Amino acid sequence: MYAVIQSGGKQHRVVEGETLKVELLKAESGATITFDDVLMVVNGDNIQIGAPVVAGAKVTAEVIGHGRHDKIRIIKMRRRKHYRKQQGHRQWFTELKITGISG
């Protein structure tokens, strides 16, 4: 059984017991979160596709912790003009463990 949820403007395919990183959520470590934006639920041959969400479907997850991804470098350069600009960015994330899929 798996589901597709929407979080932080992205869609994630989740399975019970899986850990995944989503955009930063305002929740304490150890807290339980419920996702109501379930776009699809697949249980064997039974497939439920929402329009836009599946009614009554929920995915619960436990917050493991928060962190930051690896740094990415943004480089701007104008050739022959001796202009170079560097910037770095580290995006915050929340790590979740999926505890249940219902619906």
UniProtKB/Swiss-Prot annotation:
Superkingdom, natural source: Bacteria
Name used for this protein in its record: Large ribosomal subunit protein bL21
Function: This protein binds to 23S rRNA in the presence of protein L20.
Gene: rplU
Similarity field: Belongs to the bacterial ribosomal protein bL21 family.
Species: Acinetobacter baumannii (strain AB0057)
Source species taxonomy: Bacteria, Pseudomonadati, Pseudomonadota, Gammaproteobacteria, Moraxellales
Gene Ontology CC annotations of this record: cytoplasm; ribonucleoprotein complex; ribosome
UniProt GO MF annotations: rRNA binding; structural constituent of ribosome
Annotated keywords: Ribonucleoprotein, Ribosomal protein, RNA-binding, rRNA-binding
Assembly information from the UniProt record: Part of the 50S ribosomal subunit. Contacts protein L20.
GO annotation (BP), single: translation
Disulfide cross-links: none
InterPro entries per the UniProt record, alphabetical: bL21-like, bL21-like_sf, Ribosomal_bL21, Ribosomal_bL21_CS
